[in-house]
Regions:
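Hydrophobic/aromatic-enriched cytosolic interaction surfaces used to assemble or bind macromolecules
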Residues: 1-237
Length: 237
């Protein structure tokens, strides 16, 4: 609420970008049959239903750009989750212009896996549209699995970039991962980036300015915003 009141005093309303918790969002993709791109919105629920643990009626599906002969990137979240987030944001006086899954706010480049150590939860981005959240006890295993998957898909061994605050002993994380790589005869490089501040020190820079092409905004469909005349009225209620 305090932040909402602070923003209300600005002469120009700020553009608010909210982050959706990684563990509550499934980032996946769907292969659309040739010639069916125009019907992709209608087809998506049927194309990804087998990947879900929930009933398709209980989830919201947001999609990324549709490219010819390419899988369609999607983000899936339970309706109950996104409604709770929007309720909290509006109650605090912070109507969001965008709602982005946390992993897609990590810095990333081709041939790299990025991971941010943030307390008990770690964020991983393993591709333009791939990412997840996991607990810190499983992050090294998850990184090794994702790196091997990249190689199995025909790519080179990806470099791994670790973003870690000083109190998390970044050098120790780097050594553990390098030892694991050596034991598995893995050739990918490991780079450790010590950062100050919380997770937003890593995620924040990617959220500034216009939304790049490698984000999926969850505010689509029934959760989309009416931005006409500067309005931020959401239709999800």
């Amino acid at each position: 609420p305090e932040l909402g009141r602070y923003c209300a005093d600005w002469p120009v309303a700020p553009r608010i970008v909210a982050l959706a918790p990684a563990r509550q969002v499934l980032l996946s993709s769907a292969h659309v049959p040739a010639g069916q791109q125009r019907y992709v919105k209608q087809a998506l629920p049927f194309l990804i239903e087998e990947k879900l643990a929930e009933d398709i009626e209980d989830v919201h599906i947001a999609m990324g750009p549709v490219a010819r002969e390419q899988p369609v990137p999607v983000a899936v979240v339970r309706h109950l989750e996104i409604i709770a987030w929007l309720d909290a944001l509006y109650t605090a006086g912070l109507p969001p212009a965008s709602l982005i899954p946390e992993p897609l706010a990590l810095p990333w480049r081709e041939g790299q896996i990025s991971v941010a150590i943030a307390g008990d939860c770690c964020l991983i981005r393993a591709g333009q549209w791939r990412g997840l959240g996991c607990d810190r006890d499983n992050v090294l295993t998850a990184l090794s699995t994702l790196a091997r998957q990249c190689q199995d898909d025909g790519g080179a061994a990806p470099a791994i970039a670790i973003y870690c605050p000083e109190e998390e002993e970044p050098a120790a994380w780097g050594r553990c991962l390098q030892q694991q790589h050596a034991a598995a005869d893995y050739a990918g490089e490991v780079a450790v980036h010590e950062r100050e501040g919380g997770p937003l020190a890593v995620l924040g820079p990617q959220l500034v300015g216009e939304a790049p092409a490698d984000r999926i905004d969850l505010l689509q469909g029934g959760y989309g915003s009416d931005r006409s005349a500067g309005a931020r009225r959401f239709n999800w209620r």
